[in-house]
Design a protein with these regions (language model features):
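Charged (often Lys/Glu-rich) extended helix/loop segments that serve as interaction or gating elements
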Residues: 136-200
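Catalytic beta/alpha-barrel core
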Residues: 1, 22
Length: 200
């Protein structure tokens, strides 16, 4: 934030930049870890005299909480941390907004995030935005495994399946050995997030 402010200098923007500071998980990736540090940043944004910035909401990534802190209970704990911080943000920093945006990214615990954040009550409406942790489509293997894990957790009440959204066709260029085939496609054609593309 301070770097953006410094680079803008004395400019007065016609449309303020909407800012969504990130709350991070312990042992995770980016994002502010401590509540007091997060609230301090919100205060700096809210009190900025340039009027070039608007505190528009909160961002987070719950997927890393599941990895770093192990499982869906860790995601619930991370959501509780976020809810606690949100409830301590002074309302004058968002009361003028039509809605406050709360966004989280991840592809294996979006049901928990959606349910938890949709119950937050503030003086303005909440918009919950779920961001997939993948680019365009899910990888078959890891997310099917995650889905089975979700279905086995009675608290999550999963009764649906993920539907394939992208299918890529390719020629078989060569089969030089048993159980070894080369296709006319590669990682540039079918980039993957976790686990190799799966022939179907």
């Amino acid at each position: 934030f301070l770097n953006i402010k410094k680079n803008l200098g004395d400019q007065n923007l016609t449309n303020p930049i909407n800012l969504l500071p990130e709350i991070g998980a312990e042992n995770g990736r980016t994002g502010i870890r401590k509540k007091e540090d997060f609230l301090k940043l919100v205060n700096i944004i809210g009190e900025d005299s340039s009027k070039n910035f608007t505190f528009a909401g909160i961002s987070s990534y719950e997927g890393i909480a599941a990895v770093a802190m192990k499982g869906s209970n860790a995601v619930h704990d991370f959501c509780s941390k976020i809810e606690d911080i949100i409830n301590d943000i002074p309302s004058n920093y968002y009361s003028h907004l039509n809605e406050l945006l709360i966004t989280a990214g991840g592809s294996t615990h979006f049901d928990i995030v959606g349910e938890r954040f949709s119950k937050i009550k503030l003086s303005v409406p909440i918009k919950v935005l779920l961001r997939s942790g993948c680019y365009i489509t899910h990888d078959h293997g890891p997310y099917l495994d995650a889905l089975e894990t979700a279905k086995s957790d009675s608290n999550r009440q999963w009764d649906q399946s993920l539907q394939p959204a992208l299918e890529i066709w390719s020629y078989v260029q060569s089969i030089p050995e048993n159980n070894l085939a080369f296709l006319t496609m590669g990682k540039r054609d079918a980039p993957y997030d976790s686990g190799l593309p799966k022939p179907i």
